[in-house]
Amino acid sequence: MVAPFDLLRSGFPYYMTLGQRRVTSNPMDIGFGKENVYVLTRGGLGNEVRVINWDDENLGTRGGASLFQWPVALLVDDEENLYVSDEANHKIVIMDKEGEHIRSFGEQGSEPGKLDRPSGMVFDAEGNIIVSDTVNNRIQRFTTEGELLQCFGESGSDEGAFSMPWGVTVDQSGNIYVADWKNDR
């Protein structure tokens, strides 16, 4: 019997490669829907979300230069709405699964609720969005409507401080973990 996957030299299972029959320029992030894979690309031919199904069929693109300039991270909710952090425009862009713009929130600034080069994002257990507010050296939590719920962190290297936080995730207990880029932690 042939397994539907292979094993990479690193020891991790390798299941399949999607998207090789088309140009995928500078993939940045990936999200999964019920039947589709969403690949966020930027630069070159990118700045869009490519949609591919599990049969490796190209289902087109969503977003593009009219909605975001320098996309970094992608989230997909249960309704397959797409959330993209746009580093250059300092905002979060929300589209439906067909690519129609629902709303955006965020503007450049250092006050709580404003963003300066947002990067990583994750949903919490309630469906709110936790965002790495990279240049402001903090983490912010918003509703999907863009209402600020929480803001924490400051510039520095002490406990509770960040220097260019980039990635963010949350565990089942609600603890938030941050990849603190310039502090190398």
Regions found by a protein language model. Name each.
Residues F32-E35, V76-E79, F123-E126, V170-S173:
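Residue-level detector of Asp-centered blade-edge/turn motifs that repeat once per structural unit
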